[in-house]
Amino acid sequence: AQDRLGAGRVYHCMNSVGQMWRAFDMMVRRSMEREVHGGMLDTKQFVHGFIADSYMDIQASRLMTIRCAEIMEQGGDARTDISAIKVFVPAAMHRVVDRAIQVHGALGVSAEIPLEGMYRGARTLRLADGPDEVHRILIAKNVLNRYRNGESWDFGT
């Protein structure tokens, strides 16, 4: 059962990366189209921060998910990585979509664009298949067990 859950979690994380990418694209385009207080949103430093932070969230999520899928594909023990993406990716999606909503203003929470649905979906994923706290405990236990056995953690190459 855990193998099926693991593959499902990877699938949901890959889907979340795609949704983050879409929200990011919408946010950047909106910042280039929207004028506020005599200037375009894309000239504002807070928007630069939103773009940079979202870029990092998406890249980290994408790379963590790919790494996890590679471990699974090679038949390795991916339990810790599965728990890590289960915690990190939905939280990152929540942050990226929240920033996109901020850039869109009231339009961001309307049914006219998909951001409000993405926001709800991201929050729901943080509860599905066990809350974040359970997975954090599993990550810590797996890491500590390896160190207690005289090993260190291999983050890959």
Q: Could you say what each language-model-derived stretch is?
A:
Residues 2-157:
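Alpha-helical interface subdomain recognition
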